[in-house]
Amino acid sequence: MPPKKGGDGIKPPPIIGRFGTSLKIGIVGLPNVGKSTFFNVLTNSQASAENFPFCTIDPNESRVPVPDERFDFLCQYHKPASKIPAFLNVVDIAGLVKGAHNGQGLGNAFLSHISACDGIFHLTRAFEDDDITHVEGSVDPVRDIEIIHEELQLKDEEMVGPIIDKLEKVAVRGGDKKLKPEYDIMCKVKSWVIDQKKPVRFYHDWNDKEIEVLNKHLFLTSKPMVYLVNLSEKDYIRKKNKWLIKIKEWVDKYDPGALVIPFSGALELRLQELSAEERQKYLEANMTQSALPKIIKAGFAALQLEYFFTAGPDEVRAWTIRKGTKAPQAAGKIHTDFEKGFIMAEVMKYEDFKEEGSENAVKAAGKYRQQGRNYIVEDGDIIFFKFNTPQQPKKK
């Protein structure tokens, strides 16, 4: 059953995965495709980036600020004492090889590292370099993408069987009626994952009860994926590479709606070694730009995260929430008392604030809104919360 299409294209997938905002996106790919170099330039860290299949054994984790012109504008406007942007948590995971689900390479350890992440930067290599060996002997990014997909799929298939066997023993043969709905849902998952051999996230009509069960098991193929294509510096600058069209065709066919972002690890490394002035000159001379801001934003969005702002002379801050969060729960991100004693959210749209020039001007234009507890916070809202302070119990 293909994903349903809405009026604006592909129907967005349901949110499957851990609930919360401290979510991680893992960099996944075959060995020697440029994962550690990408992680280094993304986080300005120095994880080992040797030409060796398993140079990253323990996943390196870092967090990177999410670039946002709105945040920058609010900081310039308020000139606050404290500036706190939103952050994306990124994990560099060692290279997967064919047969990983059976323990090949460092197999199951790597798959468990992926399981601990909430989304995937699927990095594939589309550059030739005789000095950097390819574990499969040749450069073919479409083949490499298929290998990773197959390993994740096979691991999920391997997981489903024991879960159903255990539930069948208790819910069917043991007569535990409470677990029967979970058993039925897992049978549906089995039909989709094993019989039809499709990733969990490709089914766009999981209901709330089914998602609750899926979230207990965190299947690898339920994780959202952003495809990153590592090009040579030359190909990235000239925006040409023989593999790009083939990769896009594959993704459109097998992972519709997923983003494909070309970048060049070599270019990003070069830019990092230049001074700010030299970097600007180099980018202008080659009529190009870094792909990192776009990649960071795409990873953040893939995790179904967004943020609202609190802004003033003391602090400008981006508060990370899940998409669909209501005002009281958003207030609770600041302090639990804000949620418990929630009265209302006073909301300005960033665009209105920038256009009108001040909070008072937004109010005068009738664009300052008072929202109740059913208001769903939108990305980029500037919010001031009103709340009652909980009464302290009287001492006896």
Swiss-Prot record:
GO CC terms, sorted: cytoplasm; nucleolus
Pfam families: MMR_HSR1, YchF-GTPase_C
Gene name, Swiss-Prot/TrEMBL: OLA1
Modified residues (N6-acetyllysine): 294
GO function terms (MF aspect): ATP binding; ATP hydrolysis activity; GTP binding; metal ion binding; ribosomal large subunit binding
Family: Belongs to the TRAFAC class OBG-HflX-like GTPase superfamily. OBG GTPase family. YchF/OLA1 subfamily.
Magnesium found in the keyword field: yes
NCBIfam families recorded: redox-regulated ATPase YchF
Compartment(s) where it occurs, according to its Swiss-Prot or TrEMBL record: Cytoplasm; Nucleus; Nucleus, Nucleolus
Name of this protein: Obg-like ATPase 1
